[in-house]
């Protein structure tokens, strides 16, 4: 091997060592001057520049228009709900006091604070990482051809990757806003849930006044102030509560009647029996002779169906016909 070839191989071996070395600044600082004083250092640089020129480096920054539109759509939604943009969350909460949007605005403020904290921490990490990469490229530029154009292109790629993470953070915040809307502001729901505290206050008053659960207008106004809701909502709540309470009591009564012992139940078909086909008031009308049986009571001075009050002979014949039905034929 010639002396020139040996020098080139030595130079390349030293370059390879840099890639395998650990981040020992002292060793790197000692190795850098040795590479630069090598007589073939400039020749290696020229070869690397020539090879780099053969690589097609597109200077056009291809923008993903669809991703950009989605990002703008997320920003618009977050600004409309006060999660992004000027911080007027406290003002919106004060304006929503006493309405059904009060708790919704409080939850939006939590989403805004979480998004701000995560974005701020991520931006700090991103800035630190970009500075580190730029410093590495600058140091490597002493030994391999790294142009300013290449550095800018690489930094733009890194910014694009970090922007994707920001997009995910915004998307997560938007999903939380959508869930809050479904929970608090969905107009398709038949009713809106009050807060746990408001429900406890209203239930406490209802149970304390169970015999007369009809609060006056003054009481409704006081309850509305305590629960941060409107007087109309208080009236609707008590109306619905009374209906549900009556239905519950009726259901419990039916279950108690069904769970009675067999000996306590009336026979099937008897007046008051659960499966009787005749109403109680007209059960006795099916057999007009039933009212002539001994012991049957009827209004004084009134004979049912214009019969006499009691005829023993007719009753004896009737009972005998029931006992011997074949003899009457």
Swiss-Prot record:
Residues 250-266 have a biased composition (Basic and acidic residues). Residues 10-90 are annotated as: PBC-A. It is found in: Nucleus. This is Homeobox protein ceh-40. InterPro entries: HD, Homeobox_CS, Homeodomain-like_sf, KN_HD, PBX_PBC_dom, TALE_homeobox. Plays a role in regulating gene expression in dopaminergic neurons, acting redundantly with homeobox protein ceh-20 in head neurons. May activate dopamine pathway genes in concert with ETS domain-containing protein ast-1, and homeobox proteins ceh-43 and ceh-20. Residues 187-249 bind DNA. GO terms for molecular function: cis-regulatory region sequence-specific DNA binding; DNA-binding transcription factor activity, RNA polymerase II-specific. The keyword Transferase does not apply. Expressed in head dopaminergic neurons.
